[in-house]
A protein has these predicted regions:
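A cytosolic small-molecule/anion-sensing beta-strand core signal
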Residues: 56-57, 72-73, 91
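Conserved short histidine dyad/triad with adjacent acidic residue
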Residues: 31-47
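Ligand-binding loop in jelly-roll beta-barrel domains
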Residues: 81-103
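A short, N-terminal "cap"/entry segment at the start of jelly-roll beta-barrel domains
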Residues: 1-27, 42
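Short acidic-glycine-tyrosine-enriched beta hairpin
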Residues: 66-81
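Glycine- and acidic-residue-biased ligand/ion/polar-headgroup-sensing regions
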Residues: 48-50, 54-60
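Short beta-strand segments in beta-sandwich/barrel cores
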Residues: 40-42, 58-63
Length: 103
């Protein structure tokens, strides 16, 4: 069983499916992330990692370099390293998140 943990942004919860310790790749993590309506991952960046989001359910607003993007089920967002981004759940959301370390 995969047990949920609090996200690194101290909101919502995530179920970690795979980490870099479990593979010989540049992958940092694959997780299913769940946020409740109104929860926000404040603006931040990752200097050594690219991040990818596949929205599974719900509606959210992803802000990338000050540009707001409305996201819903089926949407895929790619965030390059060193790119400011934030995420606000408009409704309860579920996202597959993938992090990949830079080479």
């Amino acid at each position: 069983d995969i047990h949920p943990i609090v996200t690194t942004h101290h909101i919502g919860k995530k179920y970690i499916l795979l980490t870099n310790e479990e593979t010989n790749t540049d992958l940092t993590q694959i997780a299913v992330t769940q946020l409740k309506a109104g929860e926000t991952a404040e603006e931040h960046l990752h200097p050594t990692m690219e991040e990818f989001f596949l929205f599974q359910k719900g509606d959210a607003i992803m802000t990338v370099n000050k540009e707001q993007i409305v996201c819903s089920s089926g949407d895929f967002i790619s965030i390059p390293a060193n790119t400011l981004h934030s995420l606000k759940a408009v409704t309860d959301i579920e996202i597959i998140t993938i992090g990949c370390a830079l080479r």
